[in-house]
């Protein structure tokens, strides 16, 4: 059986478990990147899905995850805590951009690459899912190059992983 579609769930720190499971499955030939046609993801899964779209080298990903000086990126200042009520989150889209910048540069992609441009380069449909909190009812929004072709990859990932109070919502 050939796996053509990956579905990556959210779950915050569970994203590390998901990463390990995907790596194990790939290394044991349960799936091959060459056969992947689409990635459907939410929250932490969208971050991992973004990594997989930009590099398919597990050693590069391992080195990045383990050796990046995360303390320099994740700096929670007293100002961020005090502005939490107004901004509704400690981190914003700039953090997501900083996380993905090395991979975008290594692929020679613009850091503002759109979902349509990414599809044209990878030929993989990338779907991020988010919830619209501004509607009368909570509605799930599917984000892909089919529905939002001009949306930047980092913005789509940020929208999907906008955990309340951690990341500022994107309207």
Q: Language-model segments: which ranges?
A:
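Patatin-like phospholipase
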Residues: 1-42, 50-171
